[in-house]
Each structure stands twice: as structure tokens, then as C-alpha cells.
A protein has these predicted regions:
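Interdomain hinge/lid region at the active-site interface
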Residues: 165, 169, 213-215, 219-281, ...
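Rossmann-fold NAD(P) dinucleotide-binding segment
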Residues: 54-117
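NAD(P)-dependent dehydrogenase/reductase Rossmann-like domain
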Residues: 273-306
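NAD(P)+-binding Rossmann beta1-loop-alpha1 motif at the extreme N-terminus of oxidoreductases
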Residues: 1-67, 92, 97-98, 127, ...
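Rossmann-fold dinucleotide-binding core
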Residues: 7, 100-180
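Active-site-proximal catalytic alpha-helix in oxidoreductases
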Residues: 134-139, 160, 164-196, 205-219, ...
Length: 306
């Protein structure tokens, strides 16, 4: 274990917690921090050392990882003289796994202490991907920094070098842009089929074996069928990502109406069911308005239990 770099890990939520556990299982010495005592207890039970703060976690790390819900959380953790960024030692590497603003990551890299490297590495693949090491990680950074990060991140899933610092977040947000559009569209497609006499199981099978197939069809539709709508990701976080996507879209000199429409229907779902409601309530809104049921019998194991 002495040959392994010392890992600091801040943010042990739905995604960060399983990622931290995978690094522990791979043999890395991990120091962890989270404001949630239960999350900390799970990490320490698996062998992590408990840090007293995010800054304390950063101070002894060779590689420091953050996995936080929103950019403002990253700013709270990293910024200022007492923040984690200032405590990173020369030669260390900060890997931000948060879906973040490109400009924020670039600004923190410019402020980093001498000899500290930074990469952005937001992830996709949901909670089950985090648990099973089947995430996709989009990394932005220099070639040497990517190589160093990849040696650790490969224990979490497929690692893709997207280009210079910040491009990891651009790619992640593009993938989410497509997910939001498709998540909204699948509810409309199911509603059209049901309202015109097609049985839901037949419709789902047909879509999976057609040009309409997608990750959403295979991975997320069962959460609709089960009726829990996947509470591992909230409408509030969907809208946060959609706002970040719209910031990127300001650089596109064309109208992008599908993204605008997706943001609108997610906002409508949040206004009706609450910001904390599960992400696929964007489909429940269609069910409720159309008086249709999209329940389908089956052994639908929730993604966070897979």
C-alpha cells in the first residue's frame, strides 16, 4: 500500500460514496470527509481515515478528489485562505468529479498553489455505475495530468481524455443535454403509444429494437415502470445542470429549441412535485395530465441497488 498515492476524498453522497469505496477496495489509502455522519461512517467502516474538514482532507493528499452536488459547493470547499485548494501541497493533483462550470475549474487552476495540478473529471453512469465501477469519466487537463489521473480513475470506469482543462465538463454537460431531451421525449412517446392502444411492454420491447433505442430506454424506463422515478437524482439537480448547459449554449450562434423545451418541462415538473422530487417526475407529469398509467409488472431492481 505504501506505493499507492494518498487519496483525499470529499463528498460521499450518492455518487461520491460508492466511488470512494471502490478506491478503498483497490487498495488506496483514503482520507475522507463529508458533512453527513452516516456517509462518513460507511467510508470509515470500509477503511478510510476520517478528516476533520475538507481542508484537513486536502492537506495530506497526493491526489485530492471532490464529488459535490453543485458548483457553489465546490467554491465553498475550495476557496479562500482556509479552503482546501490552499492546503494542497506541491506536486499534488486535484481531480474535480463534480459537474461544474468550465470557468470555475479554470479559475481555481489559476489560483492553485505552485506545483499543484488540476483536472476536471465529471462522471456519468448513475449510482449503479458508481457502485460497479462502470462509470464513464470525462477528463479535461494536460496529457501528463490526465495520465496521472487515469491511473486512479480507471478503478471507477472508462476514462476519456476530452482535451484541455474544462473540456471534461463541456462533454459531460452535452451528454446530460441529450439525456434531458430524451428523458422528456420518452414520456411523450410512451403516452402516444398507450393512448392509441399499444400495450406498454410491447411498446418498450419495440423501442429497444429500433432507432428509438437509447440508454434512457434501457436504464431509466424501468424506474418509470416501477413508479419511483429514480430518486437518486432530483429535479433540482436536473435544473442545475440545464442552467449550466444554457450557459454553454450562449456560445452557439443558433437557436436550440429542444434544450429550451427540455428545461421548460423539467421546471414544470419541479413546480408541480417539488424540487426534491425524483428526476423522472418529468414523465409522471405526462401520466397525470393524460390520466395514463405507465406501471409495468416486472422485477425492477432500483439502479442504486444494482
Amino acid at each position: 500500500m505504501t506505493d499507492f498515492p494518498r487519496i483525499g476524498f470529499v463528498g460521499l453522497g450518492n455518487m461520491g460514496g460508492p466511488m470512494c469505496l471502490r478506491l478503498l477496495a483497490a487498495g488506496y489509502p483514503v482520507t475522507a470527509f463529508d458533512l453527513n455522519p452516516e456517509a462518513m461512517a460507511r467510508a470509515t467502516a470500509a477503511g478510510a481515515r476520517a478528516a476533520s474538514s475538507a481542508a484537513d482532507c486536502a492537506a495530506g493528499s497526493d491526489i485530492f478528489l471532490t464529488s459535490l452536488p453543485r458548483p457553489d459547493h465546490v467554491e465553498t470547499v475550495m476557496a479562500g485562505e482556509q479552503g482546501a485548494l490552499a492546503r494542497l501541497k506541491k506536486g499534488s493533483l486535484w481531480i474535480d468529479l463534480t459537474t461544474n462550470r468550465k470557468e470555475m475549474v479554470e479559475a481555481f487552476a489559476a489560483q492553485a498553489p505552485s506545483g499543484v495540478s488540476v483536472v476536471d473529471a465529471p462522471v456519468t453512469g448513475a449510482v449503479d455505475g458508481a457502485r460497479n465501477g462502470k462509470l464513464t469519466l470525462f477528463v479535461g487537463g494536460s496529457a501528463p495530468d490526465f495520465a496521472r489521473a487515469e491511473a486512479v480513475l480507471r478503478h471507477l470506469g472508462m476514462v476519456i481524455h476530452c482535451g484541455p482543462l474544462g473540456t471534461g465538463n463541456v462533454v459531460k454537460l452535452v451528454t446530460n443535454q441529450l439525456w434531458f431531451i430524451y428523458a422528456a421525449a420518452i414520456g411523450e412517446g410512451f403516452a402516444t403509444g398507450l393512448a392509441n392502444g399499444v400495450e406498454l411492454g410491447t411498446l418498450w420491447h419495440a423501442i429497444q429494437n429500433s432507432v428509438g433505442d437509447s440508454f434512457v430506454v434501457r436504464h431509466d424506463a424501468p424506474s418509470i415502470f416501477a413508479g419511483h422515478y429514480d430518486p437518486s437524482f432530483s429535479l433540482d439537480l436536473c435544473l442545475k445542470d440545464l442552467r449550466l448547459i444554457q450557459e454553454l449554449n450562449r456560445n452557439v450562434r443558433a437557436a436550440l429549441p429542444m434544450t429550451v423545451a427540455a428545461e421548460g418541462v423539467f421546471a414544470l415538473a419541479a413546480s408541480r412535485y417539488g424540487a426534491a422530487a425524483a428526476e423522472l417526475h418529468v414523465v409522471k407529469r405526462i401520466e397525470d395530465d393524460a390520466a395514463l398509467s405507465m406501471r409495468l409488472k416486472g422485477d425492477w431492481v432500483p439502479p442504486w441497488e444494482q
